[in-house]
């Protein structure tokens, strides 16, 4: 029985030791969990700041884009103001209006050309639905089928983009 008590006591000591080790391990794991939870909070906070920064960046870019458009329009308006004022002066001094209007017309045309505006050729050209809008057709002896007989309203290209189609009358053989 004495031996049993010793074994029991040893077993109890081992159990006690194992329990202490497990408690120590549990404490370590709890500390590890706390550290990981703190890391998760930090990452979440960082991610939220990044998201807010990105949203602010997007808003700033949209604002900048609107400002660029506004400034581009302002630059064009400033160029057109000279032409506008010249036209106003020509109207006020009608005695030499034809010469004045011709100068204004050339100045206005040159300003638009410098901004990238060009006319779309039409009369005598082959009809192209990407450039021209046919509103009339006519059988005409002087033109081949599909050739533009008359330009009713001029079309324009701004840089490489069509901004106004030419309105035309096209030859259509019967």
Swiss-Prot record:
Superkingdom, taxonomy of origin: Archaea
Gene Ontology CC entries for this record: cytoplasm
Main location: cytoplasm
CDD domains xrefs: GrpE (cd00446)
GO molecular function: adenyl-nucleotide exchange factor activity; protein homodimerization activity; protein-folding chaperone binding; unfolded protein binding
Subcellular location: Cytoplasm
InterPro entries associated with the record: GrpE (IPR000740), GrpE_coiled_coil (IPR013805), GrpE_head (IPR009012)
Keyword line: Chaperone, Cytoplasm, Stress response
Task performed by this protein: Participates actively in the response to hyperosmotic and heat shock by preventing the aggregation of stress-denatured proteins, in association with DnaK and GrpE. It is the nucleotide exchange factor for DnaK and may function as a thermosensor. Unfolded proteins bind initially to DnaJ; upon interaction with the DnaJ-bound protein, DnaK hydrolyzes its bound ATP, resulting in the formation of a stable complex. GrpE releases ADP from DnaK; ATP binding to DnaK triggers the release of the substrate protein, thus completing the reaction cycle.
Subunit composition and interactions: Homodimer.
Membership in a protein family: Belongs to the GrpE family.
Protein name from the UniProt record: Protein GrpE
Source species: Methanothermobacter thermautotrophicus (strain ATCC 29096 / DSM 1053 / JCM 10044 / NBRC 100330 / Delta H) (Methanobacterium thermoautotrophicum)
